[in-house]
């Protein structure tokens, strides 16, 4: 047996790839493994890695989806160049194994790992497998899936879930006390870092409908809008007759998500992979409005994992309205036992200590080579 000492992680472009990779990196580091990172110049991952001590390696990979004819014409050169860069980097640092998180940086890096006969691990964050991971799965040593059944059944596929920050995971140790309480319902609205315009516009309308029906049944609200939509959302609440105080907080970002989840009874938002994983692990009921413009409807399939267990309600964006959302909120507010049942069902679904499990599997398999 040979102890694993160095791992190259490939993750770039979006928080959905980078944040889970960071969680796994910390677990590998805690086991004495040196972590290197393959990313792109000027990508969000480069800034996030500042101060971590992980050595950052850059390749000229770029995404191709929806980038126009010029990008597609240049794709063969770009892919060949980034593959060669990846090979040179791996020859230099000689990692024991490579972990790809999907996305455009994992493509050339994964092929380079194959060329150099490095063990290749993949993690797929969504219920629908992305293009890069779908191709690389054929040559991978292990494939980690965040949603059961994302990949075809195989001895190399392991259902592990999505890594969630430790402070958020700890929230799930206590479920909200809903059934016996008479306090106002607490809504956590997650508009996302980029802002979910449809959700941000509809929430003030829904609260206005609830107030018309029963002024005493208006929930307390913490609403994260995303930076670009803060002013418009604040104006929408003001136009609907709400004061931005006394139980209504509207902010561009939420710094302490663990505290926000602990406070909430019901979460309303998109159904990105990380959000769905967090909702499950903290054990909260949710109303999910999947982002409708992904070609493969990733977020809809993510949300169905919760809804199939009666842990969430899905409202597809074309059906989203103030009346519909108010109706769903009012029904759950009136039946706190159902709200608690949804929270309990979500909590029962969630894998825990996912980053730890992935690190353990990687070191066990690599050590056994």
List the model feature ranges, each with a label.
Residues 351-369:
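C-terminal alpha-helical cap of glycosyltransferases
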Residues 4-12, 29-81, 227-229, 318:
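Conserved nucleotide-sugar phosphate-binding/catalytic loop shared by glycosyltransferases and other
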Residues 313-316, 320-337:
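C-terminal "capping" alpha-helix adjacent to the active site of nucleotide-linked donor transferases
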Residues 34, 55, 114-174:
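Active-site-proximal region of nucleotide-activated glycan assembly enzymes
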Residues 338-352:
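A short, well-ordered alpha-helix in the C-terminal region of glycosyltransferases
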Residues 85-99, 106-121, 134-138:
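Glycosyltransferases and closely related glycan-assembly transferases
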Residues 95-97, 259-277, 284:
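Acidic donor-binding loop of glycosyltransferase active sites
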Residues 48, 52, 173-267, 300-304, ...:
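Donor-nucleotide binding loops and adjacent catalytic segments primarily
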